[in-house]
A protein has these predicted regions:
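Membrane-proximal, lumen/periplasm-facing interface regions of secretory-pathway glyco-
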Residues: 306-313, 335-391, 401-415, 440-446, ...
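Membrane-interface alpha helices of multi-pass inner-membrane proteins
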Residues: 47, 155-171, 182, 205-208
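Membrane-interface transmembrane helices that cradle and orient dolichyl/undecaprenyl
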Residues: 140-158, 331
């Protein structure tokens, strides 16, 4: 690595910008259909609310705003996600530059995020709220480290923005600023930064950002937390010791799943020279160690006293995203030479930057050879186009939010309701005809689903209409494989 490049790391951000633009292009080329989180964003962008359910509303608010400016489209979805990811990597790189002297290690730390499967693959595949958590964590972490090293009014404000956004992204984000606070208080050299009057600005900014949602949360706490708690505590009828064992083992597996590949890659590219780093440290490595320790203790307490039995790897994003930076800080503290390792590392990154988009596209396109179909293979748009030739729907009732979001993408001017989300119930009086659409399971009944029939009776006083079937070829179909949808038309009473 030349001395010029060591002084100038802007090439990292140019490389990342090109990579995320490539990801936008790949997503648009893969399929017009939407996956679960994408469809949720499109469906819920029909209205603006202080809260929507088990997930806090940050991403919904952001996507709603963008759709208001650009219209509903897959391009708007993909650009928002990849722009958030790019900004997150940018802030991560700026944070690394604050506390690492070796610019090669700054590059390795920043691009090292691409070695974490949950960050590089899962976030692109479908996740939205986890992307918002990473974005918020990157803002907070930059503001936090800058407040410790180069304190200013702006740095404390940035930290407050990160906390506010993070709590609006996922509730478990609260563990990150708590861990950071405890970790900094444990170091006498950093303690004055915590007892700084400017910390009041951090708290006030965070509170202002989350205040609208807090008022909603006060009246909807059960609605907002029930689903998450159900996922976390799904241990069946296991005894307390068995539940704790399940929780601890799931946490261990989640940590290995999250960090294993990154640790393996660093071990390979640095080889034996990595060994001295294991026993080396600095003020910054000690800070990050305490943060990660507090975070993990917090989760263990949730397992032991909160009944959590299933910890998912993506829930570790608010804390373990600092892993590449932590390893690089250890390497620098040991005085390890980085020139050869950097060249090897860039080969790995090149493989990842080419391989991940190819894998994302291939997981859908390979269906023409394997006959294994993903949600993105489903032909929602051709189905709706055919049904609109029969009649132009004035409103649509979908069997679930996945279907509702996919339908709304192609008919944004028409209200689309979902049986599984009663929170959105616009006035349908005078809107006719009403189109009902549902997914047909393979070899399942073709009749109108009971919950849709009940919805019609309760909301419209309408009897069960004739159920019909339409099938369309899968995207990237093998042979004559087709996907079936059930549908029905209802002429509503005036």
């Amino acid at each position: 690595m030349t001395e010029t490049n060591r002084r100038d790391i802007s090439w990292i951000f140019a490389l990342l910008a090109a990579y995320f633009m490539l990801q936008v292009g790949v997503r648009l080329a893969t399929s017009h259909s939407l996956d679960l989180d994408e469809a949720e964003q499109v469906f819920r962008s029909q209205w603006l609310a202080a809260g929507y359910g088990p997930q806090p509303p940050f991403y919904n608010w952001l996507q709603y705003t963008v759709f208001q400016l650009t219209g509903v489209s897959l391009a708007a979805l993909s650009v928002v996600k990849n722009l958030l990811l790019f900004i997150s990597y940018l802030l991560y790189g700026l944070t690394a530059r604050l506390i690492l002297r070796d610019k090669a290690l700054v590059a390795i730390a920043t691009l090292g995020l691409l070695t974490i499967p949950q960050m590089v693959f899962e976030m692109q595949r479908d996740l939205t709220h986890t992307v918002a958590v990473f974005f918020s964590a990157s803002i907070f972490f930059y503001g936090f480290i800058r407040s410790l090293k180069q304190p200013s009014l702006a740095s404390y404000l940035i930290a407050g923005v990160g906390i506010g956004f993070g709590l609006l992204a996922k509730y478990n984000f609260a563990i990150l600023p708590a861990a950071a606070l405890i970790a900094a208080l444990a170091d006498a050299r950093l303690r004055p930064r915590i007892f700084d009057r400017r910390l009041v600005l951090t708290a006030v900014v965070a509170l202002i950002i989350i205040l609208p949602h807090l008022f909603w949360l006060k009246d909807n706490l059960d609605f907002a937390t029930a689903r998450t708690l159900e996922k976390m505590t799904a241990s069946g009828h296991a005894s307390y010791p068995a539940q704790v064992a399940m929780g601890v083992s799931s946490l261990a597996l989640a940590v290995i799943s999250f960090a294993g590949l990154t640790v393996a890659i660093f071990a390979i590219i640095f080889g034996k020279s990595l060994r001295p780093a294991l026993g080396s440290g600095s003020q910054w490595t000690q800070l990050l160690e305490r943060m990660m320790l507090v975070f993990l203790i917090g989760i263990l307490l949730l397992i032991v006293f909160g009944g959590a039995a299933g910890i998912k790897d993506r829930w570790l994003v608010p804390m373990l995203f600092i892993l590449p930076l932590y390893v690089c800080l250890k390497i620098e503290a040991a005085g390890v030479t980085t020139a050869k390792a950097f060249r090897r590392f860039m080969i790995v990154i090149a493989i990842i930057m080419i391989g991940v988009p190819a894998a994302l596209y291939g997981s859908v396109a390979a269906a023409r050879f394997t006959g294994h179909y993903e949600r993105l293979n489903r032909p929602y748009a051709p189905m709706l186009e055919t049904l609109r030739q029969q009649a132009e729907p004035a409103a649509i009732l979908a069997g679930d939010s996945l279907l509702a979001g996919n339908l709304r993408q192609d008919i944004p001017g028409v209200p689309v309701l979902s049986v599984d989300y009663p929170g959105f119930s616009p006035d349908l009086s005078g809107r006719r005809p009403l189109l009902l659409v549902w997914l047909l399971p393979k070899d399942g009944s073709e009749a109108l689903p009971p919950d849709m029939a009940q919805w019609l009776q309760t909301n419209l006083g309408a009897s069960t209409p004739e159920a019909l079937v339409i099938d369309k070829p899968y995207f990237y179909q093998r042979g004559d494989d087709r996907y079936r949808f059930g549908y029905a038309w209802v002429n509503q009473p005036g």
